[in-house]
Amino acid sequence: TRVKSSAASDVYKRQYRDLAIEQKKLAPQKDNYWKYESKKVKRLLFRLVNYIQPDTIVDAGRLAASSLYLKAGKEGADYTAASELSELFLEAGVPVGFLYLHDYRHPEFMEEVFRICVARACGKSVFVIEGIRYTSQMKALWKRMQQDEHVGITFDLYDLGILFFDKTKIKQNYIVNF
């Protein structure tokens, strides 16, 4: 269920604590990438999913602790994890409500996943792209994503980019210190 009101802060704190405990329990089974992912980014992902309440969540990149936060944001959402293109199975006609694209060491993979998912984006879709300033290739890819005809408002959080697809708003690119 979606968290609202001033009591949301307490609810979020409780959920963050529970997710951190679950993450620590699973850590021995995972690689170092699982442990060192940014807490701030994981919490942002949780809040975005919780606010948007997407029916479909796509997590494209190496399996990481962020998967716990994405799933917890909306329980019951159709969650798809793909660390390579062959794992990206999406039902025909089903829109992608939320995409977390975080394999910035492989810009070709990110571009292909974006191409597949942008065709399935709807007005409520939100895509979060990690590593937008990691390399010159990623900077160029981020610029192309911002200029895509489907994309409306974008937020550049320096290492993270957020794309909104609501075309009722005027297309605008914001740079925000995060």
Where are these regions (language model features)?
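Single conserved hydrophobic/aromatic residue that forms the stacking wall/gate
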Residues: 1-8, 12
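Short SAM/SAH-binding signature in class I
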Residues: 94-101
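Short His-Asn-centered micro-motif
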Residues: 59-61, 82-83, 101-103, 129-132
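C-terminal substrate-binding/active-site "lid" region of AdoMet-derived donor-dependent transferases
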Residues: 109-178
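A glycine-rich, hydrophobic loop/mini-helix early in the fold
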Residues: 16, 22-37
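SAM cofactor-binding core of SAM-dependent methyltransferases
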Residues: 32-94
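Short, surface-exposed connector motifs at secondary-structure boundaries
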Residues: 52-54, 96, 122-127
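A conditional alpha-helix N-cap/helix-loop micro-motif detector
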Residues: 38-39, 106-110
